Amino acid sequence: MSNPATKIEILYPEYGNQGGDNGNALYLEACLPKENFVYTSHATTPYFVENTPSAIIMGGMTEAQQELIISRLMPYKDRLAELADQGVPMLFAGNASELFGEKIVNPDGSEIEALGLFKFTTTRYMPQRFHDVQVGEFDPGNGKEPFVVVGFKMQFTLTEGDNSNCYFLKNKVGFGINKESKLEGFRRKNAIATWLIG
């Protein structure tokens, strides 16, 4: 039996479904009753603004939707940082992760200010696309044994930033945040930004 106090917030499910990345939410929905989920759409104030959710999840989207969601979340970026520092689990997968860096650079050199939860810059290289299979080790850092995570990456972007002390995975197979890196994603306590999908 589930605890009705458990509230998992799915941010912008109408957008966060690129590459089937809404599968993270669908899996949780198959495991827990509907009462455990809160869905924030573009027309509503996020649940996390006035409440502390049990977890926050968002999947990948189009570039135009990225910019729309940044504008929607910008007034609440300090609250997101506060929740991350409190240890609230968050998973931003695929290009949803890019919303939480410092900026996104377009192919024409123009820049989009991002939410700043993590210290990285993302550069868009459209129409060039980067694909990769990922096999990496995740260390929960809580005294439990590290375990292997397998996934796939499909993106128009590469990222610059120092994640040597805050990475999500140490890859055995596949590139990390860019082609020179083996360290995938960023982590701030239990908040994870990763380009992995699937």
Regions found by a protein language model. Give the residues of each.
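N-terminal beta1-alpha1 cap of cysteine-dependent amidohydrolase-like domains
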Residues: 1-85
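Pocket-forming structural segment of enzyme catalytic cores
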Residues: 107-185
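Structural motif
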Residues: 55-59, 91, 193-195
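Cysteine-nucleophile active-site neighborhood
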Residues: 62-140
